[in-house]
Amino acid sequence: MRRRAFLRMVAAAAVEPVRGLAQRRDATDAVTLDAAARAYRVQPGGSIQAALEAAAKDPANKIVYVHAGTYRPAAHGQALIWFNERHDGITLEAVGEVVLTAANPAIADNKAPSFPAVVNHVVYFGDGVSTKTVLRGFRVTGAKNYTTGTGQRSPIESDDVPKTPFFYLDGGGIKIYARAYPTIERVEVVGNYTSPCGAGVSVEHLGRPLDAAVFRDCIFRDNRTQVTGAAFDLLHGSRATLDNCLFVGNVANLGADYIGLLTGGEYHPEHGSGAMTVFERSRAEVSRCTFTGNWAGVDDNGTGSTYVKSIFWNNTLKGGISTGARYEIDITSGGGVRESFIHGETNDLRGTIDRAVNTFDPPDPRFDAQFVPQAPEYGAVGYRPAAAASRGRTSR
């Protein structure tokens, strides 16, 4: 009860009131319907959210193409773009190099620590979104611990869905909340910061997941958090599947675990948290992923997690405050780790991984510039860059 009371206090006192909503858009003239492609198109200066709303009302055209450029919030708010049940089944796809950012220095408070961010989350997936909803081909960046909104009312989620403090605080790049199970492909989540957790992605299924959020061919790079899950956080009772993803340069534990300190127990204070954190009653299914050059690899207190044909290599990056040894995997139940290559300062922090079905201290993978291992021993394991589909990468 003390912890719940404290979290309510965080939500009420540590975040500022709503100053404006990201719904305010006046550039909808850059959104058009392409009947031949059966898709809506958004050009630079246009409103992606307006296109999503149009597609939500349109029974025949459920694709939104966003053309090359950088898309910023037009106003302070809780998300640059958001998906709810009415948006289920829409594919939002980048055409060319498309950046979605939380930053807008023209309207941000340049004296605030969060400058130049003006939204809590770059992308929000809310209650009622299934795996038929697809986000593909974007770069997601710019979150910097900006937080607005309190309580149970939110412009990006139904009043009927309960809001935890982490609804507002976590998931600077992408927040996945309640019964939301999107499919996210070829997305690069880079350069985000949040406190306490989940700077790149925060998945919060509120304890009763009916499915898993799906990530394929994604990159998580240079994300930072005050406490846990620098790149990816699976909060209590959540599920995610990650296939062919890269984690590099992510740092957790930048400061004190202020939630743990005030509620009777810091989270993994000695060795800290990894690029990916899996909390109790959660499950991660990870295959053909690479974790390298992070503050730590993975910490997993979940149930039934699997890590298959993945690479954990030298996750010893400096930057956090935990004084214990850096580690590749810290997992309470290691039976699901198999056919993986593991090497670092501490390979298996808890000694729970079966060495007979994994390779400890393998040869140097000799990563190239895209983190593809050149050593032949690694031919069947780890991340490989996905070839961009012609539909999403050509000029239209």
Residue ranges and their predicted role:
Residues 49, 53-59, 72-93, 99-136, ...:
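Extracellular beta-strand-rich solenoid/capping regions of secreted or surface-exposed proteins
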Residues 37, 61, 68, 78, ...:
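Surface-exposed or flexible loop/turn and strand-edge residues in extracellular/cell-surface modules
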